[in-house]
UniProtKB/Swiss-Prot annotation:
The chain crosses the membrane at residues 8-28, 72-92, 146-166, 206-226. One of its GO terms (cellular component) is neuronal cell body. This is 3-oxo-5-alpha-steroid 4-dehydrogenase 2. It holds the Pfam family Steroid_dh. It comes from the Eukaryota. Its main location: membrane. It comes from Mus musculus. InterPro entries: 3-oxo-5-alpha-steroid_4-DH, 3-oxo-5_a-steroid_4-DH_C, SRD5A/TECR. Its EC number is 1.3.1.22.
Length: 254
């Protein structure tokens, strides 16, 4: 029996994402990893960064690719499949490339479990909607929302990958010290990698034009925007010669 779309879990999942994003803004605290891992309780177990990132990002990739593989439709036919392919591409990079290259600090078990639960839930929400609920007209590939959205998705992913690469080059293997990032969008903002991912998921939301995608983009903006804000404060506090003209997330504005 073919699986049909059930709107209630889709709307509930989307509302949960939006609520989580709003709560992040209300509480105004950064997630306790990386530069902010000092706030983690000393009794919490830590996982190696590479293993933690691989395992926590893997569910989103497995869920999205699994749903694409099991459906009877052509992989690159309907727009929903192509859009889910973009989602899968992001998590392929996060799971199999970023996780193996990262030189970040160990992650607490609490942060790891939260991130894993998020990737499972959001992966199911986005994949389920695009495979079983999304209905696009035949001309969607020529629609401006799709074209502009895909452009910004690719642009944002490129910025994110490039910025992450620049951050890795600041630290030799085994080092835990911090240096001022220079070049690229880091010339203008402290959270260039965060800005790239925000642009990426906003592009995805535009191309998808769906409630789950916009809820995910909103959550990403809130979560990574908060991280960028506290990263900026961290740099200003640590480095007396930190560029005063550099903003936290949005060039020349914020």
């Amino acid at each position: 029996m073919p699986i049909v779309c059930h709107q209630v879990p889709v709307l509930a999942g989307s509302a949960t994402l939006a609520t989580m994003g709003t709560l992040i803004l209300c509480f105004g605290k950064p997630a306790s990893y990386g530069k902010h891992s000092e706030s983690v309780s000393s009794g919490v177990p830590l996982l190696p960064a590479r293993i933690a990132w691989f395992l926590q990002e893997l569910p989103s990739f497995v869920v999205s690719v699994g749903m694409l593989a099991w459906q009877p439709r052509s992989l690159f036919g309907p727009p929903g499949n192509v859009l889910l392919g973009l989602f899968s591409a992001h998590y392929f990079h996060r799971t199999f490339i970023y996780s193996l290259l990262t030189r970040g600090r160990p992650l607490s078990a609490v942060i790891f479990l939260k991130a894993t639960a998020f990737c499972i839930g959001n992966g199911l929400l986005q994949a389920y909607y695009l495979v079983y609920c999304a209905e696009y007209p035949e001309e969607w590939y020529t629609d401006m929302r799709f074209s502009v959205g895909v452009f910004f998705f690719i642009l944002g992913m490129g910025i994110n990958i490039h910025s992450d690469c620049m951050l890795r080059q600041l630290r030799k293997p085994g080092e835990v010290i911090y240096r001022i990032p220079q070049g690229g969008l880091f010339t203008y903002v402290s959270g260039a990698n965060f800005l790239g991912e925000i642009i990426e998921w906003m592009g995805y939301a535009l191309a998808t034009w769906s409630v789950p995608a916009f809820a995910f983009a909103f959550f990403t903006l809130c979560f990574l925007g908060m991280q960028a804000f506290y990263h900026h404060r961290f740099y200003l506090k640590m480095f007396k010669d930190y560029p005063k003209s550099r903003k936290a997330l949005i060039p020349f504005i914020f």
